[in-house]
């Protein structure tokens, strides 16, 4: 039973990483310039990504990942 739970959590972590990185790749592949695209990534001088108020796609993806990790047995 523990073996199945461990495999399930490994699958879940892999799936969440895949979802997170596919959202990043999708946004960075947009052809529009930063000024025209409300979904473009913006980076600060310290190398961290800056989320704007209208970056709801990223916020939803990151919130979903955090909620799943917090409620999973691995997060406790």
From Swiss-Prot:
Sugar-modified residues: 54
Main location: secreted
Signal peptide stretch: 1-24
Motif range (RxLR-dEER): 49-64
Residue ranges of coiled coil: none
Comment field on protein domains: The RxLR-dEER motif acts to carry the protein into the host cell cytoplasm through binding to cell surface phosphatidylinositol-3-phosphate.
Family assignment from sequence similarity: Belongs to the RxLR effector family.
Full protein name: Secreted RxLR effector protein 31
Biological classification of the source: Eukaryota, Sar, Stramenopiles, Oomycota, Peronosporales
